[in-house]
């Protein structure tokens, strides 16, 4: 059974947790660069995300529900909401059941230590044969996605 965990930000990731093999495959959130009003912008690539999901027997997806943070600008909040919408739309197109989960819920359930390093450390503990996926500080999106998928598998 494949459970998908998604950290939906532009520096997030998508994790495919195989509950039988107890392994995880992680891909960085697919993004594309485009120019709007003369400025370079990045957004989630719906087509590439769909390609990553295609052909897999996915049982369910768990998507991190993140709210706007104090101090974020309107453009930033809109951009994040657009990313969430793209991800939810692609999952819906593949008829994959989606559960939204707060960071607090999944972090507590997987016994994650606080902070981004805590996420990477916990992912390396749970998936030691794939620890190289979570080695770098910037791999926190990967570790979050993997832990969200693990959380999803444990709560089904």
Regions found by a protein language model. Give the residues of each.
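Phosphate- and other anionic-substrate recognition elements at nucleic-acid/protein interfaces
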Residues: 1-156
């Amino acid at each position: 059974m494949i459970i998908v965990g998604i950290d939906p930000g532009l520096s997030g990731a998508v994790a495919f947790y195989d509950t039988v093999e107890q392994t995880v495959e992680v891909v960085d959130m697919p993004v594309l660069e485009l120019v709007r009003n003369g400025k370079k912008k990045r957004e989630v690539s719906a087509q590439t995300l769909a390609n990553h999901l295609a052909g897999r027997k996915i049982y369910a997806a768990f998507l991190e529900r993140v709210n706007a943070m104090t101090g974020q600008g309107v453009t930033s909040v809109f951009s994040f909401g657009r990313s969430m919408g793209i991800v939810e739309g692609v999952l819906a197109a593949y008829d994959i059941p989606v559960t939204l989960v707060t960071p607090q819920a999944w972090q507590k359930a997987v016994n994650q230590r606080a902070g981004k390093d805590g996420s990477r450390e916990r992912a390396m503990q749970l998936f030691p044969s794939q620890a190289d996926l979570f080695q770098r500080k910037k791999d926190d999106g990967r570790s979050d996605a993997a832990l969200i998928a693990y959380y999803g598998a444990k709560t089904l």
